Amino acid sequence: MKVRASVKKICRNCKIVKRSGVVRVICIEPKHKQRQG
């Protein structure tokens, strides 16, 4: 899980999701998981 100021899609499998006010990227590739913070 990477914590970043700006979350971006890295590949076409990445999806941007907002969960309880936190922007996250979920992907089948574990390295692509990100959270805004």
Swiss-Prot record:
- Report whether Ribosomal protein shows up as a keyword of the record: yes
SUPFAM superfamilies documented for this protein: Ribosomal protein L36
- Keywords attached to this entry: Ribonucleoprotein, Ribosomal protein
Q: What molecular functions are annotated in GO for this chain?
A: structural constituent of ribosome
- Which InterPro entries does the annotation name? Ribosomal_bL36, Ribosomal_bL36_sp
Keyword check for Ribonucleoprotein: yes
Spell out the family assignment given in the record's similarity comment. Answer: Belongs to the bacterial ribosomal protein bL36 family.
Q: Which PANTHER family match?
A: 50S RIBOSOMAL PROTEIN L36, CHLOROPLASTIC, LARGE RIBOSOMAL SUBUNIT PROTEIN BL36C
Q: Know the name of this protein?
A: Large ribosomal subunit protein bL36
Q: Which organism's genome codes for this protein?
A: Shewanella frigidimarina (strain NCIMB 400)
State the taxonomy lineage. Bacteria, Pseudomonadati, Pseudomonadota, Gammaproteobacteria, Alteromonadales
| Gene name, Swiss-Prot/TrEMBL | rpmJ
